UniProtKB/Swiss-Prot annotation:
This is CLOCK-interacting pacemaker. It is found in: Nucleus; Cytoplasm, Cytosol. PANTHER family: CLOCK-INTERACTING PACEMAKER. One of its GO terms (cellular component) is nucleus. GO terms for biological process: negative regulation of circadian rhythm; negative regulation of DNA-templated transcription; rhythmic process. The gene is CIPC. Transcriptional repressor which may act as a negative-feedback regulator of CLOCK-BMAL1 transcriptional activity in the circadian-clock mechanism. May stimulate BMAL1-dependent phosphorylation of CLOCK. However, the physiological relevance of these observations is unsure, since experiments in knockout mice showed that CIPC is not critially required for basic circadian clock. Its main location: nucleus. Interacts with CLOCK. Forms a ternary complex with the CLOCK-BMAL1 heterodimer. Interacts with CAD and HSPA5. Keywords: Biological rhythms, Coiled coil, Cytoplasm, Nucleus, Phosphoprotein, Repressor, Transcription, Transcription regulation. InterPro entries: CIPC.
Length: 399
């Protein structure tokens, strides 16, 4: 019916429609040029839209409408960019004599294909406005910081303190500046310990003084190492500057401190601990030297020449002793050892008391003189009171 009505129209109306068609073609050309310029500015060019003719575009629109696909299924950014490019024009879609009307701004969230409103156009459309596709901007990905290499992270090694590091490994972490300062400290310690060592040595009347090129004795060398280790003053109330070697007479005045030969530092440490545990009264002079630090220093000042391996073991033992003393573990260990010794002695006394109680029960049950004699023999190493009680028991077996 629409085609019959269109054929019966007057030629004036047809000429007016032709004029309108030419005007629409001009407007379409202007819009195409503006869209091309906007595509060039945005860096995107749609080659397919330039090559296809209007008839091919209409066919493609027919196929898309048959499949139920709409232009508004594209991302919303395309419509926003199209509105920004043509703020005065409103976008529309024409599909074969059908104009899809847009809804209000509140219905932008809904798709046009759900409930569209159509308007039938009587004439063949000459204007087709398509939304230019714009690629979505790539959001910069925020890369996090690179994690540290798990192979270099060793939590077990970093959790515990090094009590006695090996001397060879200690020299690797020392910088050149620290080496220079340690050399100066060694020189100062040698100058301070030199006169004190020479004053204690017996000198003869006709003895020739030693030349400056004579190497220092090993005891002085070990004293330098102990000074570098940060060993505090060993004499009560003294300072590191007034530190002097201990002579053999001082050791003789301390009977509770017994030392083994310098060749066995482990035995010497055990004897030192046993000497500290003993409760025998010490002289005031020996009380000053009863600390484990003094014992380690005395071992380091021994006149015997150590080999390199023994010296390294000695230094490690001294480092361990100093660290244990500063952390308080040494005192805890000594107290624990003393408590263990007292516990063992108490356990022995309890065993003896159990045995004597068993003998007393047997003697009271049997009332035999042999049982009382056996009980008396078991109580003989006891006190005099127990002996008198035992005699009373033997005199009165009926008790």
């Amino acid at each position: 019916m629409e085609r019959k009505n269109s054929s019966r129209e007057s030629p004036r109306r047809l000429s007016a429609k032709v004029g309108k068609g030419t005007e629409m073609k001009k407007v379409a050309r202007q819009l195409g040029m503006a869209a091309a310029e906007s595509d060039k500015d945005s860096g995107f060019s749609d080659g397919s839209s330039e090559c296809l003719s209007s008839a091919e575009q209409m066919e493609s629109e027919d196929m898309l409408s048959a499949l139920g696909w709409s232009r508004e299924d594209r991302p919303r950014q395309n419509s926003k960019t199209a509105k920004n490019a043509f703020p005065t024009l409103s976008p529309m879609v024409v599909m074969k004599n059908v104009l899809v009307k847009q809804g209000s701004s509140s219905s932008q969230l809904q798709s046009w294909t759900v409930q569209p409103s159509f308007e039938v156009i009587s004439a063949q459309p000459q204007l087709l406005f398509l939304h230019p596709p714009v690629p979505s901007p790539v959001s910069p990905c925020h890369t996090g910081e690179k994690k540290s290499d798990s192979r270099n992270y060793l939590p077990i090694l970093n959790s515990y303190t090094k009590i006695a590091p090996h001397p060879g490994k200690r020299g690797l972490s020392v910088g050149p500046e620290e080496k220079g300062t340690s050399g100066v400290q060694k020189k100062i310690c040698t100058e301070r310990l030199g006169p004190s060592l020479s004053s204690n040595e017996p000198t003869k009347a006709g003895a020739v003084p030693s030349s400056p090129s004579t190497p220092a004795p090993p005891s002085a060398k070990l004293a330098e190492d102990s000074a570098l280790q940060g060993v505090p003053s060993l004499v009560a109330g003294g300072s590191p500057q007034t530190l002097q070697p201990v002579s053999s007479s001082h050791v003789a005045k301390a009977p509770s401190l017994t030392f083994a030969s310098p060749a066995s530092p482990v035995c010497a440490s055990d004897s030192t601990l046993h000497g500290l545990e003993s409760n025998s009264p010490l002289s005031p002079l020996s009380a000053n030297y009863s600390s484990p630090l003094w014992a380690a220093e005395h071992l380091c000042r021994s006149p015997d020449i150590f080999s390199e391996q023994r010296q390294s073991k000695h230094r490690r033992f001294q480092n361990t002793l100093v660290v244990l003393h500063k952390s308080g573990l040494l005192e805890i260990t000594l107290k624990t050892k003393e408590l263990i010794r007292q516990n063992q002695a108490t356990q022995v006394e309890l065993d003896q008391l159990k045995e004597q109680t068993q003998l007393f029960i047997e003697a009271t049950k049997s009332r035999a003189p042999q049982a009382w004699a056996k009980l008396q023999a078991s109580l003989t190493p006891g006190s005099s009171n127990t002996g008198s009680d035992l005699e009373a028991f033997s005199d009165h077996p009926d008790i």
